[in-house]
Amino acid sequence: MKFVLLFGVLLVTLFSYSSAEMLDDFDQADEDELLSLIEKEEARKDCIPKHHECTSNKHGCCRGHLFKYKCQCTTVVTHSGEETERCFCGTPPHHKAAELVVGFGKKIFG
């Protein structure tokens, strides 16, 4: 019985401490969120969207839902027989799998 009482007091103390910390974090998070939204809007204007050409700027792809798109390159043979490299911003297969698992987890656990 003493153990249950001690455990209950410890649990209540931890809960009250974490809720006070969360309130402080929310205040700071509001300010940080506003600044990050402004920065993201500026960065979004300069980034390359999904499925667009990124041959000249391989590190300029935009962010997806969870991950930043990667510049994926392939070698293309032109009508004249020359091989050229063409690149586009896309989601790598392992990122697609991770997004699928996260999406499935969100549906299950809400």
From Swiss-Prot:
Domain of life: Eukaryota
Signal sequence segment: 1-20
Keywords on record: Disulfide bond, Knottin, Secreted, Signal, Toxin
Any one GO molecular-function label of the UniProt entry: toxin activity
Propeptide cleavage-removed residue intervals: 21-44
Pfam family, one: Toxin_35
Coiled coil: none
GO CC terms in record: extracellular region
Compartment list: Secreted
Tissues showing expression: Expressed by the venom gland.
Disulfide bond sites: C47-C62, C54-C71, C61-C89, C73-C87
Comment on protein domains: The presence of a 'disulfide through disulfide knot' structurally defines this protein as a knottin.
Assigned protein family: Belongs to the neurotoxin 19 (CSTX) family. 03 subfamily.
Protein name: U1-lycotoxin-Ls1ff
Source organism per UniProt: Lycosa singoriensis
Lineage, top ranks: Eukaryota, Metazoa, Ecdysozoa, Arthropoda, Chelicerata
